Amino acid sequence: MLTLQPQSLDWALAHAMRYGDTDVFPVPFEYDAIRHDWDEVRQYLVQQNVIDWVVRPHRALLSPKAKYGFRVITQLDPLDFLVFTALVYEIAADIEIQRVPAASEIVLSYRVRTEPTGQFFDPAIGYRRYLEKCREVLDAEAGFTHVAIADIADFYPRIYHHRLDNALRAATQKASHVKAIMGLLSRWNGTETFGIPVGNAPSRVLAEITISDIDEALLARGIRFIRFNDDFRIFATSHSAGYRSLAVLADLLYR
């Protein structure tokens, strides 16, 4: 059995109210209703065994991406989102410790730094800093003449649950939290054993721990790279060296 801490649910609601439940759509009006009756709603939620939480229907909607592309955004039922967010919040510090250290400025996506306001990630580390750091590497580190650019196609929708489960169990000793999270994903996905909700903060934390072993493997092979989410920039001393590094990345992802 696993129950959520009241303060974790408080934080999850603060996150939803300030940052929304997706990075695309307006905050649903239901969160205002939940906040209005929060004492009673929270009391109900803290009594639930979230390992057996029964999910509600969710929305999967297309959102424009770049000029001609689209991506599917998942908008969860508000109570499901609060439970999911609180669960990930309670293990987020363990996950962050397991990742390549933020101070190295190698992985510049979604570094966990929670605040009582509902903030999940360090606002100073993001895509802008990622682009700046790429330029700094080329300017300051001698020998690099080529940059190989790669991204993972359909990253979130193709994350295998078995891989995520293993990554979470390696990152935290809170096995019941892992079981509850994997149970939510399984119920949302039905018969499919891959994919996590796209467009929300807790999913980003899960995605980062899933790919963390790829970061470590590239570093162990002496490959100089910087990553933001599913975007890699690999620095090389020649075209052939860059291609070899791309082949290593492809092989690691395939495995």
Could you say what each language-model-derived stretch is?
Residues V54-R59, Q98-V100, S176-A180:
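Short, flexible active-site-proximal loops enriched in glycine and acidic residues
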Residues F84, V88-V147:
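Active-site-proximal segment of RNA-dependent polymerases
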Residues N49, P57-L61, F70-L76, L131-A140, ...:
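Catalytic micro-motifs at enzyme active sites that drive phosphoryl/nucleotidyl and oxygen chemistry
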Residues M1-P64:
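Non-catalytic, polymerase-adjacent accessory regions of viral genome-replication enzymes
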Residues F121-N229, R233-D251:
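Conserved polymerase palm-domain catalytic core
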Residues D23-V27, R56-T85, A102-D122, R187-E208:
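Short, conserved non-catalytic motifs in the polymerase core
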Residues E90, D94, A171, L252:
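Phosphate/oxyanion-binding loops and surfaces in catalytic or ligand/nucleic-acid-binding neighborhoods
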